[in-house]
Amino acid sequence: MLRNTEYKQVIIVRTDIKMSKGKLAVQVAHAAVSAAFEAYKKKREWFLEWWATGQKKIVVKGGSERDLLKYAEMAKKKDLPVAIIRDAGLTELPPNTLTAVGIGPGPSRKIDEITGDLKLL
């Protein structure tokens, strides 16, 4: 484990589409679980340290689909776990609508380089 390193997960949500509070909550949950599973598979040390230190999560406003895809690509280039969430389209949104991106868990400083300027939801 990397001592003296803080770990977190950031969920970036679309702000250019209308979602009910319940739909938004479920999309954030999908992103958090999916990104954590990616970390567990590919960055086990990061996942375990994050898990042992309280699983810090932050939800931020991300803008459009294009914006979210840009953040996801930046995270992949930094070798961070990423989950891109697309809705099934069974209730409020058309099928395959991108709703959220989960980044991390990973070192906070690496994630902040991508999401540090985004506003909290």
From Swiss-Prot:
Q: Which Pfam families does this UniProt record tie to the protein?
A: PTH2 (PF01981)
Q: Which Gene Ontology terms cover its molecular function?
A: peptidyl-tRNA hydrolase activity
Q: Where in the cell is it found?
A: Cytoplasm
Q: Which GO terms describe its biological process?
A: translation
Q: Which family does it belong to?
A: Belongs to the PTH2 family.
Which InterPro entries does the UniProt record give? Pep_tRNA_hydro_II_dom_sf, Pept_tRNA_hydro_arch, PTH2
The reaction(s) catalysed by this protein are:
an N-acyl-L-alpha-aminoacyl-tRNA + H2O = an N-acyl-L-amino acid + a tRNA + H(+)
- Nucleus: is it a keyword of this entry? no
Q: What class of enzyme is it?
A: hydrolase
What is the role of the protein in this entry? Answer: The natural substrate for this enzyme may be peptidyl-tRNAs which drop off the ribosome during protein synthesis.
Q: Which domain of life is it from?
A: Archaea
This protein is called Peptidyl-tRNA hydrolase
Enzyme Commission number, as recorded: 3.1.1.29
Q: Which GO terms describe its cellular component?
A: cytosol
Q: Which UniProt keywords apply?
A: Cytoplasm, Hydrolase
